[in-house]
Amino acid sequence: MVQVVENRSRVRGRVMNVAQHPTMDGYAVVDLALSDVAPVSGYANLFGHETGKVVSVNIPWGDARSHGLMPGDDLSAVVRRAGPQAVFADPASLAKG
């Protein structure tokens, strides 16, 4: 089993794709091309070397829809890595534009 240290990062990037998550009901997968990554005080920053990469971020489907997320949009959020391939956004931190 892989253990992940408690972590948070503030990211900004361009939405490349939005789709329903293939296995997690109620979630969207947003592919985000990261243009900026900043630490969140008190947490490890596991995204410090991810600038310029595309990261798949899990966002509750209702939040993705309420923000009208579409490819080409700019998005910022606080994210956490929950496993090697699992990244989740804090819905309260989502900001489009």
Label every model-predicted segment:
Residues 1-3, 20, 67:
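Outer-membrane beta-barrel proteins
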Residues 34-37, 81-97:
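OB-fold/S1-family single-stranded nucleic acid-binding modules
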